[in-house]
Each structure stands twice: as C-alpha cells, then as structure tokens.
Curated annotation (Swiss-Prot):
BP GO annotations: DNA integration; DNA recombination; establishment of integrated proviral latency; symbiont entry into host cell; viral genome integration into host DNA
A matching Pfam family: Phage_integrase
Record-stated family: Belongs to the 'phage' integrase family.
SUPFAM superfamilies to which the protein is assigned, alphabetical: DNA breaking-rejoining enzymes
InterPro entries from the UniProt entry: CB (IPR044068), DNA_brk_join_enz (IPR011010), Integrase-like_cat_sf (IPR013762), Integrase_catalytic (IPR002104), Tyrosine_recombinase_XerCD (IPR050090)
Native source species: Sinorhizobium fredii (strain NBRC 101917 / NGR234)
Protein known as: Putative integrase/recombinase y4rB
Length: 314
C-alpha cells in the first residue's frame, strides 16, 4: 500500500472514531489516491484536485463540489504530515444545495395515511401483517421524530415497554440515544408485536421490530414504494407526480410542532432548542434550526411574542 493510500485509511479510521461513517468519502478518497498515482504525484495539488473532482464531465455541479469537498477536508489533515500538500481553497466549485421544501402534514393527513395502510389488500395469509407493519412504522415516524433509517433498524431489544423508551443505535453520526414513548405508542407497538407473533409463528423470530412477510428487516425501497402508493391513493401526490410529501417531512413536522407547543406554553424556545437537538440526534443546534423553518404556526407564535414584547415596552 502506498504512503498516500495509507494516509487515507488512517484519516478515515480517525474520523470514524469520532462517530462519522464516511462511506462515500472513503470511496472517493481511495479513487483520488489512484488518480494521483496514475499522475505520478505523491502529494495533493489544487490543480489535480480540481481535475479529479470534475469527473465525469457530464456530472452535476453538486457532484463536483462534493468530490472537491472530500479532498479539501482530507488535505487539511494531510498537510500536517506533508508540507507539500496544497489545500484547495473554498469557492473553486461553488454550489449552494437546494433543500427540498418540507411538506407540513396535518393531523388529518396522517390519519388518512394510517387508515390507508390498514386497508392495504392482502393476497396471501403470510402478508396479513403487512398493513399493521406499515401502520405502526408510519405512525411511529409521525409521533417520534425518528429518521426512517433509525426506525427501520430498531430491534426488539431496543424497545423497553417498562421504561417506555426506545434505544436508537448506530445513528447518522454513530451515536446512540434514548427516545421516550407515549403510553399510546407503547400500546400500539405491544399490539403489533402480538399480531406479529400470531402471523409469523412458523418463522424464525427476527431480531428487528419491523419485518417483511418473509421475516426480514423491511427493505427501504419497499417502504418508499408503499408510501408513494398510499400517498397517491389518499391524494397527497398526483397519480404521475415524481415529487411530493416525503417520509422525512414527518420529522420536520415533529420538530415544528414541538416548538409551537413551547411557544404556546410561554416557554423560551431558544433555551430549549438544544434539548430538541439532542432528542433528534443532531450534532449541532444549527442542524435543528433548519427543521424549524416554513411553518405558519411558528411564524404566528413568533409574531405574537414579538408584539407582546413591544406592548410591554410602550
């Protein structure tokens, strides 16, 4: 293994020790190492970093910017050991990512989605649990603020009914956290597990909470396809729409509803925001602030509080 490739591996291991997963980063930097070797250059130069980042030439600018970002961050690390390293300056491949505008689900939207899940047809005996699986999965996402991957990866051992707590492991940033459950959520999950034991008695018990009719962990593609089909069925998406409400938007709604309740209870949202950030599994409070944009209820409560402050001063 070349010295540069070894440096890449050491860098990845160091960052993973801090909780980052870096799967795409690792693939990108290994490819960049091969690119440097092909150009007979043992150290990073801005010129070669740009040349590598802009491959393939038909890719989107966002792809180029992401690739250059991998190299820039690694170059800062590498410069400590190799003073010949050039750190590509920021702004060489400017790109401002456009976040999808979140859909603010109403209570009625969620109720119709869950009802449609329970009404999904079952052709075979072994798939009779499927409606209940998606009813519970979508319901849990709507009341917990979990990421889809976190809910999908839940294991039976992660559900503590006595303490009314979920243990979320292997999260986006590699950290575990505890998420409390409401009594009604516990009741629904208990009922689901009872039905699961009845319908899957002949199968080997899966360690995962949400399983397919074959007893495996739910496939993420099937989850999205099911959600899209149900969304079109209840009118959240048009029959031919390729874009529309997403499952991740439930997380946004959970965060905004939490802040609205704080406003209505006359609590200080700025002081409590770090608590919500920890609950959601964010590393930085700024990551949580994104979820708190675009809500009419939030704007109304913020304006109400601002008007009261002005009244108190006059």
């Amino acid at each position: 293994m070349s010295t540069f490739r070894q440096a890449v591996q050491e860098y990845i291991e160091m960052r993973r020790g801090l909780g980052f997963k870096l799967r795409e980063t690792e693939r990108g930097l290994i490819d960049f190492a091969a690119f440097l070797e092909a150009n007979d250059t043992p150290h990073i130069t801005t010129e070669l970093a740009l040349a590598w980042a802009q491959r393939p030439s038909r890719a989107q600018p966002s792809h180029w910017a992401t690739r250059l970002g991998y190299v820039r961050v690694f170059a800062r690390y590498r410069a400590a050991a190799d003073p010949r390293t050039q750190i590509p300056p920021s702004g060489l491949l400017p790109f401002r990512p456009k976040r999808a505008r979140p859909y603010l689900y109403s209570k009625e939207d969620i109720q119709r989605l869950l009802s449609a899940a329970l009404e999904m047809p079952c052709r075979y005996t072994r798939c009779k649990l499927r409606p209940w699986t998606y009813y519970c999965l979508f319901g849990l996402l709507s009341v917990s603020g979990l990421r889809l991957g976190e809910a999908r990866n839940l294991k039976l051992a992660d559900v503590d009914f006595d303490a009314a707590v979920l243990t979320i492991r292997g999260t986006k940033f590699g950290k575990s956290r505890l998420v409390p459950m409401h009594a009604s959520t516990c009741a629904v999950l208990r009922d689901y597990l009872k039905r699961r034991r009845q319908h899957c008695a002949a199968q080997a018990a899966s360690p995962y909470l949400f399983t397919s009719q074959l007893g495996n962990r739910l496939d993420v593609g099937d989850i999205h396809r099911t959600f899209y089909a149900l969304s079109r069925q209840i009118g959240l998406r048009g029959a031919t729409d390729s874009h529309g409400p997403r499952l991740h938007d439930m997380r946004h709604v959970f965060a905004t509803n939490t802040l609205v309740r704080w406003y209505e209870a006359e609590q200080d949202p700025e002081r409590l925001l770090p608590i919500l950030s920890t609950y959601l599994g964010h590393v930085h409070v700024a990551d949580t602030q994104w979820y708190l944009t675009g809500s009419p209820e939030l704007m109304k409560e913020a304006m109400r509080r601002l008007e009261r402050r002005w009244e108190d001063r006059t």
